[in-house]
Amino acid sequence: MNYEGFRALSYNAADQKNAELMAPVYRNVPKDIPVIGTHVWPAQAAIHAGMKYVVNAIPDNWPMALHLSEGSVHTIQCHNSYMGYRILNGMNKEKVNRPMPADSLVYTGHYIDHELVQGIEADCAARIRRKENGKPMRFLLTIGGAGAQKEIFAAIIKYLLPYIEKKQAALYVNVGDYKNVWDALIAEIPEMKKYATEHFDNWTDTEEFAKKALDEKEEIEGIHGFWHKNIFEAVYCTNLLMRSCDV
């Protein structure tokens, strides 16, 4: 399954039916209490349970039928995503679909993580100083929930390797809980191994690195790979690394 599969209305139809199994979670919740689903399944389940005010907060900017919860208000982050959902672009192959009702879509703007916002002034000042002082520019690559970006990662890493070697760039690679992606990258680009430090399934080590990277006295070089078996750690790792990266 890839993003084209998740894009199909037929995939969503099966998901909406399966979500009936989760409706009992809302059985004892008053039906006029607002519900915000940060994934489509709880939003779909809330609709099945008869909740009256359901917001489906869509995290992806690639319009996919996977994220549709019929009967809820869908919040969208960017204009092109809004238009893609409005016309259900490509969700029924080449057929032109009836548009979603205008009142079921709301353009909200970008969702920004607390960690990025709370230190934004100090962190941006540190970014400027790194640039002025000729420090390596720090790039952060993060895998998505489906683990489907390996080819894109490989192309970026191949391009950056000469700059990493010259200490003009440094790279964080968070493969989430997909260790197979890291292994595939190493297999495809064996030369990256000599620059790589692996921070694997050790949350304390990850926290310590993220803290160290914020210290301007510390030199961050090479490639730092992050993988965690625990899904929360796999995702939240990115929140910690964002503050010290440049791109």
Placement of each model-derived feature along the sequence:
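Short glycine-/small-residue-rich Rossmann-like dinucleotide-binding loops
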Residues: 40, 144, 246
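Structural motif
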Residues: 33-34, 53, 138, 240, ...
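A nucleotide-sugar donor-handling region in carbohydrate enzymes
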Residues: 71-158, 174-183
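Active-site and donor-binding regions of nucleotide-sugar-utilizing enzymes
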Residues: 1-101
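Structural alpha-beta junctions
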Residues: 50-54, 79, 94-104, 161-170, ...
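Short boundary motifs at domain starts and secondary-structure transition points
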Residues: 25-27, 65-66, 127-133, 215-216
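Conserved beta-strand scaffold positions in the cores of enzyme catalytic domains, especially
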Residues: 54, 104-107, 224-227
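Donor-nucleotide binding loops and adjacent catalytic segments primarily
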Residues: 130-243
